[in-house]
């Protein structure tokens, strides 16, 4: 499995203290992704990156690729870190350290500055979702398999508890459905939200364009909060729980200050 890391050993490659003027759009660098595969870099499958497209092929595995976007490109991560070499989850202080580095250089992305996100994706087949969630929309243990998932992790304004919204492509769960996944570790309890952006096999093998209002959906899920800083964007294709193969391509992920005129707001 290929792991692409564009990093600086000390993790301090981005320079400049002057806050850049905010552009109307922020296209993500689609060539810089860090791997998380839940199998210590041994998850079966492969990734292909080129031409502003990343294609993830998961073979009975769960493959995730992520980056920390900033106003001037992905935040470099030190490739010598043990959890990076193991394709593991970020260690406990990573979020705080990454935020501090970006804030010192005034390059953090505020969700309210870029409320819209658009992207294109294509799948080669849907994944069985008959055992994904219960009737209340709670994702069942072993049910979190999706052919394509694009996730956004954010912090609430003035807070440090991570918020996550991910858009997924399902087989039969209706478009527009919001699912929730609950997880816990020691004294912490997490709730991750998945919103069905595409459903069904009609467009398998075809590129689909999506546009979402992050602020609007954040406020719908957390009505008493305001979104703060964008922390991480990830792509995930997985079939480990259902024992299936899944392939998805992702392209042209862009953050927008205003609703893109040439994109369908319902997509």
Model-predicted regions and their roles:
Residues 14-41, 265-267:
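Extracellular carbohydrate-recognition regions
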Residues 45-69, 82, 90-100:
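Short carbohydrate-recognition loop motifs
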Residues 72-89, 98, 106-117, 201-204:
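Extracellular/lumenal carbohydrate-interaction signature centered on repeated Trp-anchored short motifs
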Residues 120-126, 155, 215:
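Solvent-exposed strand-to-loop "edge" motifs in beta-rich extracellular domains
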Residues 123-130, 158, 241-244:
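Extended, low-complexity, turn-rich repeat/linker tracts enriched in Gly/Pro/Ser/Thr and Asp/Glu
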Residues 133-138, 145-150, 190-192, 204-245:
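Extracellular beta-strand ligand-recognition surfaces/modules
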Residues 162-221:
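Extracellular carbohydrate recognition and processing domains
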Residues 233, 251-255:
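Extracellular beta-strand elements of beta-rich domains used
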């Amino acid at each position: 499995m290929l792991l692409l890391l564009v990093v600086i050993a000390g993790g301090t490659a981005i320079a400049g203290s002057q806050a850049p003027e905010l552009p109307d759009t922020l296209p993500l660098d689609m060539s810089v992704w860090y791997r998380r595969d839940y199998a210590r870099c041994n998850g079966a499958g492969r990734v292909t990156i080129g031409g502003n497209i990343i294609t993830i092929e998961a073979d009975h595995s769960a493959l995730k690729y992520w980056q920390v976007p900033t106003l001037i490109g992905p935040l470099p991560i030190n490739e010598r870190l043990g959890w990076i070499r193991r394709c593991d989850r970020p260690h406990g202080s990573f979020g705080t350290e990454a935020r501090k580095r970006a804030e010192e250089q005034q390059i953090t992305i505020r969700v309210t500055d870029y409320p819209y996100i658009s992207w294109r994706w294509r799948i080669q087949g849907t994944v069985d979702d008959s055992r994904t969630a219960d009737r209340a929309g709670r994702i069942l243990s072993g049910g979190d398999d999706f052919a394509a998932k694009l996730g956004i992790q954010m912090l609430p304004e003035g807070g440090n508890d991570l918020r996550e919204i991910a858009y997924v492509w399902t087989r039969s769960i209706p478009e527009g459905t919001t699912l929730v996944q609950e997880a816990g570790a020691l004294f912490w309890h997490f709730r991750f939200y998945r919103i069905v952006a595409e459903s069904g096999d009609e467009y398998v093998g075809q590129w689909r364009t999506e546009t979402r209002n992050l602020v609007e959906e954040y406020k719908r899920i957390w009505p008493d909060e305001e979104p703060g800083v964008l922390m991480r964007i990830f792509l995930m294709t997985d079939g480990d729980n259902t024992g299936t193969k899944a392939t998805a391509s992702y392209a042209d992920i862009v953050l927008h200050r205003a609703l893109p005129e040439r994109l369908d707001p319902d997509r």
